């Protein structure tokens, strides 16, 4: 798919898809008992409140005219008891729903994060990370309330509406029908505003996502911004994105704000009709004052759940766009996964074979075409060639970070597509060009390669890769705290820490993808000595820009145009005076010029 940038809006789904809500219901099922209890408590609390107008009617029509103060006192006590019970039930219900809401947040966020962990590298390459973050954090928070309190309130307010209608008809049928005359008008109004609201809130979702993506990108690239004095230009872009957010928000709120005045206007008209109609009939002696007051109270109650449902409707429209984005992420295909009956990979000896392997990222262009080679256990295989030739794709296929289009990849005679990914990768050490450092201590970053490693094991791995010297000079040594992405470390130091982390995992197959590109020549020489000892007995694949670092490899493969152009040791390839010879001599001449 095409790459998505901070300037690019994500595609909006035109029709509302009820399947989103049906799918979301799976997160509610495990809490349905607690939600039913919450509904019952709320319904009881609401019913208590709706009995109050009937008590008021009895007080106005019987207790006060008859000056029956004992009855009046009893009615007042009954009112207080009803309101107290209602408050208690609603409080308990609120406590239950807070717990349910937080549990739903946890469940959705856990599933979303676990799925993100399985997505291919290309997914993260094609999207601003800020757009991914906002889905996991902000969007999940927003939809959780809709899935818990929102759904419960729909049921609750529907029950409330039913109770009110029943009580109205018990008090007076004619005046109850007057109240219901406003319902068709309200229905037409809500249908009209529905689609406009949904599109408006989807636009808000897009613009907020764009702003978040740009902000995250600029926080990471703050140093580059200052180096190139781009503060003013970036501030203008941020202002433009913020104005887009403000514009779409104002449009969405304008539609949302129409709901309340619309319902309120209908409510006022209906209540006016009750008094006009009721007073005419009352004048004829057919209706009591208590009846009119009771119906007026119920009319007020009647529109309250409708207004609440309107508010819930607004929130649903707002959050459906977020729910779509969450499920869109969950539906991203995991391109590399275990087969149904995948086996555990036995202990790896290290023979790796590609048998006429072909691979492409899409159907338009083959990255690798008919690639075949065998690296024996304990051998070191180097991949060299121009940028974009397919070197990194080969090592990603070895670790099964990608799937081949055709041709088996075999490790120790076992097709790696038939084994579990975890059992395969847990026996491999992979060191990429981009050395990522997590926030925490230096020791914790190294221990990431083997969570059970002792301090001695961590130091041993660090010494082998020449990282121990600079770590020991840090303020707290291995306990020195490093910030996100290792901002306080040089690029070379970050790579040395990553080397120690990789070697600590004690891999059977070691993959180094431009792993020494950011290390100075002097450090690289010292590191090479340690690596040579570490590579003994391990199969290794090495991609290196500086060809001097791979001279000692058992097998050097020159990759170009998706295939292996030539293979052999350094001496053999130099004797051929082919592709490798030309690349090596050109690089050697460049070194002499800069010396």
How would you describe each model-predicted region?
Residues 1-49, 64-75, 93-97, 101, ...:
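Membrane-integrated ABC transporters
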Residues 3-14, 102, 110-140, 213-237, ...:
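Short intracellular "coupling" helices and adjacent cytoplasmic loop segments at the cytosolic face
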Residues 19-20, 28, 93, 97-101, ...:
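Juxtamembrane loop-to-helix connectors within ABC transporter transmembrane domains
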Residues 33, 121-122, 138-147, 151, ...:
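An intracellular "coupling" helix at the cytosolic face of ABC transporter transmembrane type-1 domains
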Residues 35-89, 96, 169-174, 285-289:
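Transmembrane helix-loop-helix hairpins at lipid-water interfaces of multipass membrane proteins
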Residues 40, 48, 52, 77, ...:
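Hydrophobic alpha-helical transmembrane segments of ABC transporter permease domains
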Residues 64-75, 167-181, 251, 255-324, ...:
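Helix-loop-helix
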Residues 338-339, 345-595:
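ABC-type nucleotide-binding domain
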């Amino acid at each position: 798919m095409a790459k998505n940038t901070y300037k690019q809006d994500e595609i909006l789904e035109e029709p509302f898809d009820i399947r989103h809500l049906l799918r979301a219901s799976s997160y509610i099922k495990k809490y349905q008992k607690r939600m039913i209890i919450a509904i019952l408590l709320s319904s009881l609390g609401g019913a208590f409140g709706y009995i109050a107008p009937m008590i008021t009617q009895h007080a106005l029509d019987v207790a006060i005219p008859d000056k029956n103060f004992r009855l009046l006192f009893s009615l007042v006590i009954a009112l207080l008891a009803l309101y107290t019970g209602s408050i208690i039930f609603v409080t308990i219900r609120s406590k239950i729903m807070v717990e349910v809401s937080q549990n739903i947040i946890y469940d959705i966020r856990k599933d979303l994060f676990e799925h993100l962990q399985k997505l291919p590298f290309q997914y993260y390459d094609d999207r601003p990370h800020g757009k991914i973050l906002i889905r996991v954090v902000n969007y999940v928070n927003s939809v959780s309330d809709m899935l818990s309190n929102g759904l419960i309130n729909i049921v609750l307010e529907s029950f409330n509406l039913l109770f009110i209608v029943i009580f109205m008809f018990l008090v007076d049928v004619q005046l109850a029908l007057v109240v219901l005359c406003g319902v068709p008008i309200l229905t037409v109004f809500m249908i009209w505003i529905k689609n406009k609201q949904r599109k408006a809130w989807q636009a808000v979702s897009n613009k907020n996502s764009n702003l978040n993506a740009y902000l995250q990108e600029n926080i990471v690239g703050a140093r580059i911004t200052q180096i190139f004095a781009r503060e003013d230009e970036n501030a203008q872009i941020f202002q433009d994105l913020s104005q887009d957010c403000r514009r779409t928000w104002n449009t969405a709120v304008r539609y949302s704000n129409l709901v309340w005045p619309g319902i309120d206007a209908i409510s006022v008209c209906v209540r006016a009709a009750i008094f006009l109609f009721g007073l005419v009939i009352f004048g004829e002696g057919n209706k009591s004052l208590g009846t009119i007051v009771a119906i007026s109270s119920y009319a007020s109650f009647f529109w309250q759940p409708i207004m609440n449902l309107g508010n819930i409707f607004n929130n649903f429209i707002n959050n459906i766009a977020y729910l779509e984005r969450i499920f869109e992420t969950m539906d991203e295909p995991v391109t590399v996964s275990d087969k149904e009956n995948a086996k555990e990979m036995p202990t790896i000896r290290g023979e790796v074979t590609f048998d006429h392997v072909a691979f492409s990222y899409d159907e338009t262009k083959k990255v690798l075409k008919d690639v075949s080679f065998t690296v024996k256990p304990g051998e070191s295989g180097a991949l060299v060639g121009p940028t974009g030739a397919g070197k990194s794709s080969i090592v990603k296929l070895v670790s099964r970070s990608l799937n081949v289009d055709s041709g088996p990849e075999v490790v120790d005679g076992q097709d790696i597509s038939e084994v579990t990914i975890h059992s395969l990768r847990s026996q491999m050490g992979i060191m990429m060009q981009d050395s990522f450092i997590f926030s925490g201590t230096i020791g914790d970053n190294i221990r990431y390669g083997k969570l059970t490693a002792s301090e001695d094991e961590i130091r041993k791995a660090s010494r082998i890769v020449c990282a121990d010297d600079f770590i020991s000079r840090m303020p707290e040594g291995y306990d020195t705290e490093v910030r996100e992405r290792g901002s306080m470390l040089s690029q070379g130091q970050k790579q040395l820490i990553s080397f120690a982390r990789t070697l600590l995992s004690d891999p059977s197959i070691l993959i180094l993808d431009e792993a020494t590109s950011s290390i100075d020549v002097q450090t690289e020489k010292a590191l090479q000595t340690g690596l040579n000892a570490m590579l003994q007995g391990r199969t290794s694949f090495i991609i290196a820009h500086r060809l001097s670092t791979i001279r000692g490899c058992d097998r050097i493969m020159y990759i170009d145009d998706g295939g292996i152009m030539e293979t052999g040791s350094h001496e053999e390839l130099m004797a051929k005076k082919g592709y490798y010879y030309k690349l090596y001599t050109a690089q050697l001449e460049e070194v002499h010029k800069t010396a």
